[in-house]
Curated annotation (Swiss-Prot):
The modification Phosphoserine is found at residue 3. This is Putative synaptogyrin-2 like protein. GO terms for cellular component: neuromuscular junction; synaptic vesicle membrane. The chain crosses the membrane at residues 26-46, 71-91, 104-124, 146-166. It comes from the Eukaryota. Keywords: Acetylation, Membrane, Phosphoprotein, Transmembrane, Transmembrane helix. The keyword Transmembrane helix applies. Residues 197-223 are annotated as: Disordered. It is found in: Membrane. Residues 200-216 have a biased composition (Polar residues).
């Protein structure tokens, strides 16, 4: 079981709600969800209005349907990202460091992507609202401004979340480097004998050398 991997202490501990709710990453994620809900609600509720000349409903952002669709889409998908709160709650129970790594990388990529998408959305909505004729907006002007404002706030909330997730990923990488042991053998260490090899315990029998030295030429016996 891995301990201390990716910014979390030991796996298998009991879940405590109060420390969980006070974690910076959980607070940032909650703000992201609230801002996304506000943007989606403003566009869906009062993002469409008719004009004095027609009863047909148009998007209040310069009658550009793409602006309303874009703001609603990223708001809904960002709200559905509340699934990562479940991951944050379950994360300390995951003992496999590889699973933790993939979850953190997925969270990091999603947070970075949504930071960029909120930036694009803020610029898009602001541009379309700037060229909107005020006479064409009978209702929904305040909601349009609120959608733009909280799109701007979402850039920073998702950026902070991406930064915190990167710190968690970096903590896991640093922990792996510190605990890594190089499996390559030390060149200064002598090789151990093969475990199945037999040890040669042969010893020279005693008196062999003496026997060899005495086995020289001997004169024949004299009769």
């Amino acid at each position: 079981m891995e301990s201390g991997a990716y910014g979390v202490a030991e796996a298998g501990g009991s879940f405590d709600l109060r420390p969980f709710l006070t974690q910076p990453q959980v607070v940032a994620r909650a703000l992201c969800l609230v801002f996304a809900l506000i943007v989606f609600s403003c566009i869906y509720g009062e993002g469409y209005s008719n004009t004095h000349k027609s009863k047909q409903m148009y998007c209040v952002f310069n009658h550009n349907e793409d602006a309303c669709r874009y703001g609603s889409a990223i708001g809904v998908l960002a709200f559905l990202a509340s699934a990562f709160l479940v991951v944050d709650a379950y994360f300390p129970q995951i003992s496999n460091a590889t699973d933790r790594k993939y979850l953190v990388i997925g969270d990091l990529l999603f947070s970075a992507l949504w930071t960029f998408l909120w930036f694009v959305g803020f610029c898009f909505l602001t541009n379309q609202w700037a060229v909107t004729d005020p006479e064409d907006v009978l209702v929904g002007a305040d909601s349009a401004r609120a959608a733009i404002t909280f799109s701007f706030f979402s850039i920073f909330s998702w950026g902070v979340l991406a930064s915190l997730t990167y710190q968690r990923y970096k903590a896991g990488v640093d922990d792996f480097i510190q605990n890594y042991v190089d499996p390559s053998p030390d060149p200064n260490t002598a090789y151990a004998s093969y475990p199945g090899a037999s040890v040669d315990n042969y010893q020279q029998p005693p008196f062999t050398q003496n026997a060899e030295t005495t086995e020289g030429y001997q004169p024949p016996p004299v009769y």
